[in-house]
Amino acid sequence: MDVHTRWKDRLPVGPAAVPPLLLLLLLLWAPPQSRAAQPTDLLEMLDFHNLPSGVTKTTGFCATRRSSRGPDVAYRVSKDAQLSMPRKQLYPDSDFAEDFSILTTVKAKKGSQAFLVSVYNEQGIQQVGMELGRSPVFLYEDHTGKPGPEEYPLFPGINLSDGKWHRIAISVYRKNVTLILDCKKKVVKFLNRSDHPIIDVNGIIMFGSRILDDEIFEGDIQQLLFVSDHRAAYDYCEHYSPDCDTAVPDTPQSQDPNPDEYYPEGDGETYYYEYPYYEDPEDLGKEPAPTQKPVEAARETTEVPEEQTQPPPEAPTVPETSDPAGKEDDPGFGDYDYVPTDDYYTPAPYEDLGYGEGVENPDQPTNPDSGAEVPTSTIITSNTSNPAPSPGEDKDDLGGEFTEETIKNLEENYYDPYFDPDSDSNVSPSEIGPGMPANQDTIYEGIGGPRGEKGQKGEPAIIEPGMLIEGPPGPEGPAGLPGPPGTTGPTGQVGDPGERGPPGRPGLPGADGLPGPPGTMLMLPFRFGGGGDAGSKGPMVSAQESQAQAILQQARLALRGPAGPMGLTGRPGPMGPPGSGGLKGEPGDMGPQGPRGVQGPPGPTGKPGRRGRAGSDGARGMPGQTGPKGDRGFDGLAGLPGEKGHRGDPGPSGPPGLPGDDGERGDDGEVGPRGLPGEPGPRGLLGPKGPPGPPGPPGVTGMDGQPGPKGNVGPQGEPGPPGQQGNPGAQGLPGPQGAIGPPGEKGPLGKPGLPGMPGADGPPGHPGKEGPPGEKGGQGPPGPQGPIGYPGPRGVKGADGIRGLKGTKGEKGEDGFPGFKGDMGIKGDRGEIGPPGPRGEDGPEGPKGRGGPNGDPGPLGPTGEKGKLGVPGLPGYPGRQGPKGSIGFPGFPGANGEKGGRGTPGKPGPRGQRGPTGPRGERGPRGITGKPGPKGNSGGDGPAGPPGERGPNGPQGPTGFPGPKGPPGPPGKDGLPGHPGQRGETGFQGKTGPPGPPGVVGPQGPTGETGPMGERGHPGPPGPPGEQGLPGVAGKEGTKGDPGPAGLPGKDGPPGLRGFPGDRGLPGPVGALGLKGSEGPPGPPGPAGSPGERGPAGAAGPIGIPGRPGPQGPPGPAGEKGVPGEKGPQGPAGRDGLQGPVGLPGPAGPVGPPGEDGDKGEIGEPGQKGSKGDKGEQGPPGPTGPQGPIGQPGPSGADGEPGPRGQQGLFGQKGDEGSRGFPGPPGPVGLQGLPGPPGEKGETGDVGQMGPPGPPGPRGPSGAPGADGPQGPPGGIGNPGAVGEKGEPGEAGEPGLPGEGGPLGPKGERGEKGEVGPSGAAGPPGPKGPPGDDGPKGSPGPVGFPGDPGPPGEPGPAGQDGPPGDKGDDGEPGQTGSPGPTGEPGPSGPPGKRGPPGPAGPEGRQGEKGAKGEAGLEGPPGKTGPIGPQGAPGKPGPDGLRGIPGPVGEQGLPGSPGPDGPPGPMGPPGLPGLKGDSGPKGEKGHPGLIGLIGPPGEQGEKGDRGLPGPQGSSGPKGEQGITGPSGPLGPPGPPGLPGPPGPKGAKGSSGPTGPKGEAGHPGLPGPPGPPGEVIQPLPIQASRTRRNIDASQLLDDGAGESYLDYADGMEEIFGSLNSLKLEIEQMKRPLGTQQNPARTCKDLQLCHPDFPDGEYWVDPNQGCSRDSFKVYCNFTAGGSTCVFPDKKSEGARITSWPKENPGSWFSEFKRGKLLSYVDAEGNPVGVVQMTFLRLLSASAHQNITYNCYQSVAWQDAATGSYDKAIRFLGSNDEEMSYDNNPYIRALVDGCATKKGYQKTVLEIDTPKVEQVPIVDIMFNDFGEASQKFGFEVGPACFLG
């Protein structure tokens, strides 16, 4: 390949540089045209010096030039310039040269993109063109149509429209085109033309634009030359446009007429530079050369060659005339730190530069033309290079040597970015960065020839200043090693879109068809909501706007521009190896859509789709009928720690905890109501048996005496003063289950209790607040096989993937500017079908194809992988009432949760009957005798517990006003779940409205900012107690406190002997007024407010806890395969396994409650002397003693538990309206409201937009019961279940056998209250209890066929302990739920606190054993008795079997006190301490999980407008429309040259492949999915709407049969869905019919690029289509929307108009009127529609034809003036004519000459759309006898 390179830095040439013989050959072989190639000056031929219209003079390239009187002269060209010439004038006597140069000095307007010159043949095909702008294009097309448009040489990274002067030289030689820019930068591109191309000489040359092109060159031009020699381009800066410090030769467009050194004779003749040594190597003698290695692929690098010590031998000696040291005025050098030098630089020798032609090479063909066939380009560059110093020179003389400093300076100023980010560009500078500077060095492309060997060393060059050295270009040197990579350039500016390509091939067959109908399931469309932060609701957008947004989204993804320009040139690296092939280019511009592909084959059954994104909540479902309580489901997985839940119902009593260490003494609590009997104390030593004495008379209450030895239990004394807390006694044996005490008053909220055991699954709670998404959980075990879901809708295009491996084709350059639409070529022969191309990127979502015929059902596919756990589904229809399921086995205990909030106390049960007397226990062994201890005073504080966090002493609160107790309201039915609303601002307080129907609980809104402190409210009920603080300083003894809270019932002690029934005691004295209680819990909810307006849809909440299994959903169509998801959480437990072997017997169950009294046994023999008897029955009360002295006030007791909710107080009067507060924090979630009254059925909503894919539906309900399978093997340990709500109490079990007594342990330090340990293994279940009441309704499942109830499942295996949950805040009290079924008996509760003794009653006589009495009323509290001395703990013996109760033994003597025993076991908890100050507000807890959905209410009110349905399938093809009328007259082209019709043109080049055609029809539906587990008719209301389309009509005949099995309602639903889909499709792609009008013709063309020109309906203002109108759509003209003048406005026939005056408007003529316009049917177009049409248009045009006879319409050729030009009145009342409107031009002006009948066609083509259409015309040249005129008004066309 021969590429000639000429630089201003001359090649050094010495005497031995060129062998004389070779020089002689060069001169002899030079053809004549190479010696005198005459340039043609286009500016001269276009008459620029006479300044035609649109051309003015201006200053040129150099403001001052040496040897010149003034600046260079240039011409400024505006948009008004229209310049062309016949091509014959360019080469009058010869053909257009095959190889030529185009030379120009030009400064284009910044940011413009237009053709500087265009050469057309006779057929109007552009054959040569030069486009200026960013990434300029050289257009070339020879007589064979080569190269095609996609192969036009493009020069990316170069910006010629940066508003600066550029000297541009283009050399076309063989199959290369070389661009030399500003004498420094050279880029070579491959030109794929034929071997002997022909350019027609009979066409025209246009300057500044192309035919029918809107872009017109604007800027300054100084020179434009065509030279029939490709080498002239290399000398442009020497001979044609030298630097400003050099005089200009008198060549074309000379600036200085004085002759200079180019003209030795000074005779002024035109001097044309000859090229004596520029010869084609193929014409020279072929000399053999040494074998050369193939040259590596030239890299894109700027090379500074190493110093060459030998000049090339071929270079002849030529005088040098340029002064390379004087570059300061050269605009091309900008702000360079230019290094002047007197030295000359040597490019690499020929051999190193890789000239391979004419050299025999074993690796290359020797055919001299072979180099021209290779589509590669080698670019030779040589910036600067120094020769080696001659022996006499000093090294320092090398002023031009490239030092590091030089390179650094060059780097700093090297990029002179031509791109100005402030230019008219819609891309921000950050997205683009600077373009490639126009003065950057050469870019390499392609593969060079083989590398030659190094030549012999030459002699130093002899150079005299002023000599012009013209050497032939040296061959390319080997590429250097790659320099360091330059910094990545910023992204280039996005190119304009290219021309539309030809239609593509038919699309591939359509995708596989939808999966077959689901197993009698139904999918309803739900709108897809975007996730993310909750934003405000946006405006409703039309379908077209949403489509535009989707297109914009696609475009945004495609906005990534091509790679930016190359980075700064690195320092020269060593030679690099050849690069591999470039990356594959990006896809070309998309052609028009291809024809629809053939219908694809039926698709196979789709795999289950991957889990889609979670959708927003669906539309509210229809309320279902109330269903029965469902069977108990399997234990679910443990949920994430939720936010603080609502206050739960009281749970069952937990088992007693281990004894804690002794706590610090708390303050005395208020005296509570009488508790149940406490546990028995430790057994005393045997005393002598005394007969029971009669009760003595009541004595006076004395002072507490010294404690005597412990005697038998005496009669109940009066309550003494509160004593100090005694040391805890040893733990006694658990007694039998005590009777349930009477209901206590509701105390204050206690401290949070320890977490209880997990209860059975409670009823679904209300939806909680929406929490933030939690962290990803661990992988759960795989769940059971879910049903196959419908495939989701097609997803949006994914983000760009990472770049693939290098491909073959090079990277696509920057997007070119749009090409101009060529004439339609002759249709080519059909090419062979090419190999299938690689898969393209996903296009935007195509319209859904029509359904294909159903295929045969395929075989059932293999079971898919288990899907991830779905999110809870929407409410389903209620199922039928199922039988009550049996209670499942308890699961393994979960791990301890965090301490939960204390629940509200449960309702106390009725008092139980008294148990029978228990058997007497065996006597324990005697304890070790202790050392006698000193007499003990009142016990001191116990051992200090572990230090707690010290709470500050709380101030005593003021006394509160107790509120009256209100009756509890009845529990309301659960309402339906509503859409979560966004939190509104707090409104002003309104009057309390009547209670509205309860709303559905929405998810918790976001936390608002803390509002300002409100005014003090009425005292609330007591609040929950705070955490226990450290004990405060003991206060003075306080007044007697209120009764303390009721203690928990203790375990029953062994029953004592039956005592005498006492009379009911007198009521005790009224206690003193208590201290003010702390703030109570919130009161009962007020009446519900009226329903608010429906809020906007909230953001999608986090994935809720797994719902109970819903009904099995229908199988969905297969989704596209998504990317593999993250490893999902552990799935739910698997299905029941096979029957396992019988397990080992379980551990012993818990002790049962005591049994009924047995029959009385026979009297046994007297037993051995018994141990000390149990505490006797309460004796009769003694008489009341005198009032004791008022004791010191005791320490303040702890807050009691909150009392029961009081009655609703009367509403107070409405207060004054307060100032508006700040929004408060979100309130607690309200209670589930009652279902609203049934509403009317809503009308069918309008079709909404296609929603994105909804979430996968939840799991369907259990299927029909299968046959009992064998016992499955034990499953793996499941995750811990969530804490269930309290189960219903079960029946009492049989009493268990008494366990053996364990030994008493030593007394331990009192520990902190331990957390409840996990429950032991479950005992065998008790007998089945009676059926309980129905529980609360379950949450509705998703819509499905209701399933028959299955039998109770086998109990699942117990899960492992779950991790402890975070501590939740105290919840609000919930409403009492309806009683659940009876639960299993709970374990014994902890021992209750000792109740105060009651007053003594009178002695009764021995009565007969009565029947079990009713529960007695609560007795008054007794005073605390004195504290006895602490006995020594005995050594516990093993528990014996419970013996028959023996008689009471005699009292034994007290044993001697033993030594201090070790600390006893943990005593019961001390009394609650004082309420501490409120601690700091804790961190917000984790958001709670969304509760289960409440049961469906009755039918609601009419719903809001429905969400848009999915896109319907396209309707059947309409009938062939009537052929439209022919289009309006198009704008005439520029005047062509008259000539005979030419021969038929060559076949046009094939355009780029169009986009893939629409997918073919989907195949038949696949086989039905797996059947639903139950088939029942779906309760669908059979209301008919206008969308009622029989679904069978939408199927092919063969397909209809497969739907016959569906329930009656399915057909209607499918018909409605299909109708919705069709309507949405038509909204997205309007058809231009009266019912489905487009917005404009441009809109219609974008949707249907294949529509022909014709009449269509448009509705610019959208909305209702009733006001649409019919227009003519000119798609050929780019989608113009045309309206026509009415019949009377179409014009007037030619006549002389004798009665009218020139200069008057046509509307003032007798036969005239204002012009008005109508649509294609003759109806006037409304003002509003015209206004919208103008708003939607960027330009408008209208033609007016003036038919004349000797009358001027526009220009008067005789005078050259426009004084008589027609004037127009625009729609905006603006007068327009030649003198004030540049947008009117005469396409044909035959009337200018005033000769005979002629016509003038005026075109108004204006961006000021408000001027069009014209409404009146003024004619100015008529009235003489010989003058006539008429006119025709064309349509007004608007282009978007």
UniProtKB/Swiss-Prot annotation:
It is found in: Secreted, Extracellular space, Extracellular matrix. The keyword Repeat applies. Keywords: Collagen, Extracellular matrix, Heparin-binding, Hydroxylation, Repeat, Secreted, Signal, Sulfation. The modification 3-hydroxyproline is found at P682, P688. Residues 472-487, 689-698, 1108-1117, 1382-1400, 1456-1471, 1528-1543 have a biased composition (Pro residues). Residues 1-36 form the signal peptide. Residues 446-560 are annotated as: Interrupted collagenous region. InterPro entries: Collagen, Collagen_superfamily, ConA-like_dom_sf, Fib_collagen_C, Laminin_G, TSPN-like_N. GO terms for biological process: extracellular matrix organization. Residues 561-1572 are annotated as: Triple-helical region. Residues 258-268 have a biased composition (Acidic residues). CDD domains: LamG. Residues 231-445, 1573-1607 are annotated as: Nonhelical region. Residues 1296-1305 have a biased composition (Gly residues). Residues 72-244 form the Laminin G-like domain. Gene3D superfamilies: 2.60.120.1000, 2.60.120.200. One of its GO terms (molecular function) is heparin binding. The modification 5-hydroxylysine is found at K629, K644, K710, K746, K776, K797, K806, K809, K812, K821, K848, K866, K884, K899. Residues 1611-1839 form the Fibrillar collagen NC1 domain. PROSITE patterns: NC1_FIB. Ubiquitously expressed. Residues 839-848 have a biased composition (Basic and acidic residues). The keyword Signal applies. Belongs to the fibrillar collagen family. Type V collagen is a member of group I collagen (fibrillar forming collagen). It is a minor connective tissue component of nearly ubiquitous distribution. Type V collagen binds to DNA, heparan sulfate, thrombospondin, heparin, and insulin. This is Collagen alpha-1(V) chain. It comes from Cricetulus longicaudatus.
